[in-house]
């Protein structure tokens, strides 16, 4: 979820359909219990056996965790190639070492015994498995005056505008909703890495049909009318995909909770505008890693600016759950201040979420500052 720190964000350009207004989905209650603490966990680094799941859930219960966001589809190209899954899928390839170990099934069984909810965390277009299936669907960017496949740091991304890719990704979401008693499905990697993508031929043609000019003629390094038009179009395509995914999943399981992890709204180069897809989800999780981007703590809780201000302004009537790194020993007082100010300035926020990239140990649970 967070490795984009080294190359900021990822791709996402979705359906070429025009975004049509639909009635907003009634917001579901995330929880009736105030001030809950949730965690997000990567599967490859945490779960190799059933015993690993049981021990993890015991720790989560001990440290009063209300929700576990489980990585059911690999998010990065590291221990496992991106896009490989950790459940019994007939759609996506199962990760090596997990063909006889259904992590999602095991987690639901153990967590529900402890009254802990399980949300399936499903990254979308950072997907080497999909690229292997559809080799012509790789994301394209601009280098000099040439369009080239985007393969930053050995990472693999597919073009979200590709119809086959869209259908494939949504079929995974539907499979999870149909086969498993998950309490929610949460999407990630719904974004671009920069203004210069996607620039595949099909995307360029679709935008040119709408605007009258080829996007490769845009000066991407400056803030200008054409770049703003391009970015507005990209954000609308992303919203159109979320709309399609939401409707498809809810046709499978009507009342399932749906959400999206987002980058700070001020990162406009990522082509992600929660204001355009808020009506199709119940929860938004803004990634509030203030230290990673050299912001002060007030950037999180500011009453007139900052990530929560921007998110609430765009996503009115949508539940907001800010996501944080675990605090270091020198950050604990800062986190206490952040939470106190957040409760004052944003009283509707009732939950926070913690994420770490590696393995959750008891020493990590002990670092939790409760909301």
Where are these regions (language model features)?
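Boundary/entry segment of secreted carbohydrate-active catalytic domains
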Residues: 27-53, 60, 260-262, 327
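Substrate-binding cleft of secreted/luminal carbohydrate-active enzymes
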Residues: 281-371
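Polysaccharide-binding and catalytic clefts of secreted carbohydrate-active enzymes
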Residues: 145-280, 289-295
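Sec-dependent signal peptide cleavage junction
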Residues: 15-30
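Active-site-adjacent "subsite" loops/lids of carbohydrate-active enzymes
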Residues: 31-40, 48, 119-120, 125-179, ...
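Catalytic domains of carbohydrate-active enzymes, especially glycoside hydrolases
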Residues: 52-79, 179-184, 277-284, 348-352
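Short, acidic/polar
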Residues: 46-62, 165-176, 266-279, 331-344
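Aromatic-lined substrate-binding rim segments of carbohydrate-active enzymes
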Residues: 56, 74-126, 226-252, 301
